[in-house]
Curated annotation (Swiss-Prot):
Residues 200-239 are annotated as: Disordered. Binds 1 [2Fe-2S] cluster. It holds the Pfam family 2Fe-2S_thioredx. The keyword Disulfide bond does not apply. Its cofactor is [2Fe-2S] cluster. InterPro entries: NuoE-like (IPR002023), NuoE_dom (IPR042128), NuoE_N (IPR041921), Thioredoxin-like_sf (IPR036249). Belongs to the complex I 24 kDa subunit family. This is Probable NADH dehydrogenase [ubiquinone] flavoprotein 2, mitochondrial. PROSITE patterns: COMPLEX1_24K (PS01099). Keywords: 2Fe-2S, Electron transport, Iron, Iron-sulfur, Membrane, Metal-binding, Mitochondrion, Mitochondrion inner membrane, NAD, Oxidoreductase, Respiratory chain, Transit peptide, Translocase, Transport, Ubiquinone.
């Protein structure tokens, strides 16, 4: 195998690994595909153009580049994922170099630079969730949908990915589906959630255990006293 062929093979394998354990962000560089190239045009809808105006009105004169993340997010919500033509359109609107859009889109893993299903299932696979059964949750989804991490169902309804910490460790194991967190999961919960989504129903987000947010099971174990008011702990000279 030539050096060039070996490099291409390694890049391909790296891309597969990144997709499996990083969602649909892909490599940090763009590769033209049938659905993602400069010939595939992107324009914001008239409704979203009104939203863009409202977003940009938040930022002071000379600082509209600060709207880069909100506009990329809006483009992704309109298109379902973030193609390179959408990045170019955002850069054009904000009058910034295209590289600025690339930098943001490749840095934040919430931007999906490859197509994903209608429901993007992101299973947290880091230590707290793993210790609480994340592998079983992933296996349940794979068995239910007939796909593995990094794959999309044939009907385009679901994409599955294993991701890094989503910040809900106390509610492990958990998954993120689009914008919603589903926490304190069991395999039964996962099957019910997937059945609801398949049927067009919206399952209730949050803990499935019956607790509110991240409150402890049973009674409080800390913070039992009324917290002191402002100025507590200050040196006398500072009061």
């Amino acid at each position: 195998m030539s050096l060039a062929s070996n490099v291409l093979l390694q890049a391909s394998r790296l891309g597969e690994m990144v997709i499996k354990r990083g969602g649909a962000t892909g490599l940090m560089v763009h590769r033209d595909t049938k659905e993602n190239n400069l010939n595939v045009k992107f324009k914001f809808t008239s409704e979203n153009q009104e939203r863009i105006k409202a977003i940009m009105d938040i930022y002071p004169e000379g600082h509209k580049a600060g709207a880069l993340i909100p506009l990329l997010d809006l483009a992704q919500r309109q298109h379902g994922w973030l193609p390179i033509s959408a990045m170019h359109e955002v850069a054009k609107i904000l009058e910034v170099p295209r590289m600025r859009a690339y930098e943001v889109a490749t840095f934040y893993t919430m931007f999906n630079r490859q197509p994903v299903g209608k429901y993007f299932l992101q299973v947290c696979a880091t230590t707290p969730c793993m210790l609480r059964g994340a592998e079983t949750i992933t296996e349940t989804i794979e068995k239910k949908l007939g796909i593995h991490a990094g794959e999309t169902t044939k009907d385009g309804l679901f994409t599955l990915a294993e991701v890094e910490c989503l910040g809900a460790c106390v509610n492990a194991p958990m998954i993120q589906i689009n914008d919603d967190y589903f926490e304190d999961l069991t395999p039964k919960d996962v099957n019910e959630i997937l059945d609801d989504l398949k049927a067009g129903r919206k399952p209730a987000a949050g803990p499935r255990s019956g607790r509110l947010a991240a409150e402890p099971f049973g009674e409080l174990t800390s913070l039992k006293e009324t917290p002191p008011g402002p100025g507590f702990g200050l040196q006398a000279a500072l009061k």
